[in-house]
Structures are given as structure tokens and as C-alpha cells.
Design a protein with these regions (language model features):
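Transmembrane-helix boundary motif in ABC transporter permease subunits
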Residues: 11-17, 21, 29-59
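Alpha-helical transmembrane segments in multi-pass membrane proteins
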Residues: 26-30, 34, 38, 42, ...
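Generic hydrophobic transmembrane alpha-helix motif, especially the helices
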Residues: 29, 46, 59-93
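Membrane-embedded alpha-helices of multi-pass transport/permease systems
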Residues: 37-41, 48, 52-55, 69, ...
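Transmembrane alpha-helices
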Residues: 91, 124-156, 179, 183-190
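Short cytoplasmic-facing helical segments at TM-TM junctions of multi-pass membrane proteins
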Residues: 97-142
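Hydrophobic alpha-helical transmembrane segments of polytopic membrane proteins
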Residues: 165-201
Length: 246
């Protein structure tokens, strides 16, 4: 928590907050799409070997083609703006998640699969209730890769309308302003560290929540519940008392 606070404090103190929030907004859209797409693609590759053989060269191509090469077709299809930048980011960040998912599911212990068959789990239950939870630690490596690659794409995506910190770095490079470019670059690093720590903390909390599933949701997530209660309370106070609206 202190490290995450220090990262965001660094961004605020150096005046990069607005650009960082623009970058964070695009990353928070691209990362879930990349994770979900990679997870589903990896599960399909694990289930169907023929699909995996056909998918392998596609993933190789997505990972080896320079990012600049597919900016032009993305611009033609989606135009100049944040949408094109998010699409380019997803294309760049999805392949590692797909590969890690397929590999992680194969590495689940045979005893775990046998246990799922013994209790009569269907194919869907075997995948989502047995294999995926058992491979959570390995899958988190894929999640980390998606986050890091999404932030790695920030500067390149700024060329097609992403804005945010990537645009600040690009503008500083055009002006040869080393100081401004270094500040924006370090802000990207701080954002990456904060998101990585938050994702790891979320995974650990979910693992502990599985062991304490019998308790209520507010008891399992007291800080989130308190935050939501505070937001609702301040919103209601703003409706009742005009002084709270400002």
C-alpha cells in the first residue's frame, strides 16, 4: 500500500496527474479486454489441439511484427483517436496471455483433473472451477504481462491518438526536452509499478476469499465496502445539503 501511495504521490508532485489519469483510463479499458481475450483464446487452444496449431503462427506474427507496422491498418479501420490506440494496445498485449493460459492449464497436476472427474464435473465446471483456479498463480504472470505490455505500448499508441503520458514523452522527444521526457517516462514506470502491486494484491485477496467464502461480501472486502458506503453517503448528503455539492 505504501509503495502504491508513493507511486501516485510521485505522479502528483511532478505535475503528471492529468496525463497519468488519461493513460490509466485507456489502460483500464485495454487490460481487461486483453486478459479476457487471452484467457478465452488460451482455454480454446488447450481444449482443441488443432485450433492451437492454427493459432500458433498467428500469435507468432502478432508478437514479431513491429508495432509501427500495424498502426496504419488500425488507423484505416478505426480512425485517429483513443479507440484505435486501445485496439493497437490489445493486439500487442494479448498473445502472451493466450500462451501462458494454455501452458498453465496443461501444467495443472493430473491429480486435480482426476478429482474433478471423480466428483462428476462437467467440461465447463472442470475448466472454470477446477483448472483455472488451480492455475491462478501462473495465470497472474499473464495478467502482469498484459499490464506491462499495455504500458509499454503507451508511447507508440500516442502516435494514433492515445494522449496521456505517451503523448507527453513523444512531444518532449520532438522538442528534445530531456527533463520533460524523463518526468513523463518515470511517471509511466510509477504507474506500471502501482498497477502491478494492485493486481498482485487483488489476486492474494481473491485466494483468501475462496477460503472464507461462507462469510458475507462486506466482511470479505471491508475496505471496498467502506469506500462504497462513503461514496453513497456523500452523494446523499450532496442531494440534501447544497454545501456538500462543492
Amino acid at each position: 500500500a505504501l509503495l502504491v501511495f508513493a507511486c501516485f504521490a510521485f505522479i502528483l508532485v511532478f505535475g503528471q496527474w492529468q496525463s497519468a489519469m488519461a493513460t490509466l483510463a485507456s489502460v483500464l479499458v485495454a487490460v481487461p479486454i486483453g486478459i479476457a481475450g487471452g484467457l478465452l483464446t488460451g482455454i480454446a487452444a488447450y481444449r482443441h489441439p488443432r485450433f492451437e496449431r492454427a493459432l500458433a503462427p498467428v500469435l507468432d506474427m502478432m508478437q514479431t511484427i513491429p508495432a509501427f507496422a500495424y498502426l496504419v491498418p488500425i488507423l484505416f479501420l478505426f480512425g485517429f483517436g483513443p479507440t484505435a490506440a486501445i485496439v493497437a494496445t490489445v493486439v500487442y498485449a494479448l498473445p502472451p496471455m493466450a500462451r501462458i493460459t494454455a501452458l498453465s492449464l496443461r501444467q495443472v497436476a493430473p491429480e486435480v483433473r482426476d478429482l474433478g472427474r471423480m466428483v462428476g464435473a462437467t467440461r465447463r465446471q472442470m475448466t472454470w472451477r477446477v483448472l483455472v483456479p488451480s492455475a491462478r498463480d501462473s495465470l497472474m504472470v499473464g495478467v502482469n504481462q498484459v499490464i506491462m505490455l499495455s504500458l509499454n505500448m503507451v508511447i507508440i499508441a500516442s502516435m494514433i491518438g492515445a494522449g496521456g503520458l505517451g503523448f507527453d514523452v513523444l512531444a518532449a522527444l520532438r522538442r528534445l526536452d530531456i527533463g520533460a521526457g524523463l518526468e513523463a517516462g518515470l511517471a509511466i514506470v510509477a504507474l506500471a509499478v502501482a498497477l502491478d502491486r494492485l493486481s498482485q494484491a487483488f489476486a492474494q485477496r481473491e485466494a483468501s476469499a475462496l477460503a472464507d467464502r461462507g462469510s458475507s461480501w462486506p466482511a470479505r472486502h471491508p475496505h471496498v465496502a467502506a469506500g462504497l458506503a462513503l461514496v453513497v453517503a456523500t452523494y446523499l448528503l450532496g442531494l440534501l445539503l447544497p454545501a456538500f455539492r462543492t
